[in-house]
Amino acid sequence: MTETLLELINVPRNHVLSTIHNYLTKMTSNYEPIRRLPNMQDAGPSELAQRDNAVTKLRSVFGLRGYDRAETPILEQTELYLRKSGGTLSSRLYGFTEPGGYEVSLRPEFTAAILRQTIDNMTDSNAVRIMYDGPVFRYARPEDEDGLKTRQFTQLGAELIGPSSSDADGEIIAMSLEGLNCLEIADTRVVVGHVGVIAKALEAFDLSERAKLFLIANISELKKGGTNSVLEKAATFGFLPDTAVADLETPDNRTQIEKKIDRVLSDGIIGPFGQNIGPRTVEDIVSRLSKKLSETDDPDNFKKALQMLSAITQINGNANNALQNAKNVLSESGLDPAIISSCADVISSAQVEGVPIEQINIDFGLARGITYYTGMIFDIYSNENNSKSHQTLGGGGRYDGLTRALGYDYDFPSLGFAYNLDALVACQGPDTNSASNTYFVSPENCGSVQAAVSEASELRAAGKRAAVQYKNNGATSSSVQSEGESR
């Protein structure tokens, strides 16, 4: 039919084919190579071999402590991560609407999904020990503080579900350090904080739940010395003077407050201490705020709590000194220094597990972007790694209230931690023992392709890596030998 058509329009066949070829060549030459997405990384054979080796060793360490593997979907309903996750994490989700109509996100972490899976399948009250590993995804804008971090990385971690005692806290801390030891990562330390101590201290000031959660959510800001900025936020949300009600009725002031709330929302700050705002506008929030300001917390108590929290978040150092300094701050604030005992118990339990006290620091200003932690929290470092990049190798904590946040009608004691596996591998440095031991069998040396295939098969049957080295653009034997042994 093609020939008939060409005859009808009286155009030489070769001319038509040449024109089509030239057009296609021109069209395809305009294509740009498709590059990786920003802050996404490829992993080649040597990197994967080193990562797999680390995973195998860590699974062995965890397995010897009774932990079993579990997997969860990479894709989950977005609501799983929004509930009690805090503004920081929710603003970093890779979320979209899937064809079935569900709002879904690539997982940014494992904990919530592992807990959901465990609770749904639990048959008795015994402790459940789970380990996991896999990719997680967290978006960061280039202008953000961590905007240059890889947006996909591998987490490997463990969850201990059931025990509520500080003994379990000690187990998790000790195991996190054992993992680093098995990878021969030297000069490691653990930095421990305690959200539970902070929460218990705040109870003494007779504050509303909103006020306490607000203060806890701003620990990181207070640690940096940002007391004034926290006071400004507090005034915006009605935690300070009663005159705020009148201020809201003044058009100019109302406009300014709306702008502040809009900025706070865009920064992802409201999530940790408020309910999900859903489709409500800034105007809706301001209107609701004006109705609630008459129920505001006592400003003097709020300021005293803020002063205490500002002081205790500055405490950071070796465990014994930090505990004593925290007791002093509590006493000076008119609080019972025994409040600190729950943190001291965690340190003692870690020592029972074999962690030297010299390896433990306490930082009461340690904060988390994921706000479901309710007790001890910790980060783990290699001192050498920390001095270069100021990034943790991993961390975790206790999150006894997460089950209720996920929609269950009870709290369930749970704790865990996760490594950034890519950071662990980077901390190890290049693997000098990962050179290929593949035998490349040359058909020229064997006399024929069939003979080379047969010899390669015999080598593989003996448990050796072997491949036939076919000719490829005139590759020389010397280039082959650089990759492995040539036969």
Predicted regions and their residues:
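TRNA-binding/sensing appendages of the translation machinery
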Residues: 2-16, 20-112, 151, 165, ...
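Positively charged, Gly/Ser-enriched RNA/tRNA-binding surfaces
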Residues: 28-29, 47-65, 76-79, 111-186, ...
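Acidic, His- and aromatic-enriched active-site or binding-groove loops in soluble protein domains
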Residues: 92-101, 206-236, 382-386
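Electropositive, surface-exposed helix/loop patches at the edges of structured domains
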Residues: 102-123, 223-239
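Charged, amphipathic alpha-helical linkers/stalks
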Residues: 199-207
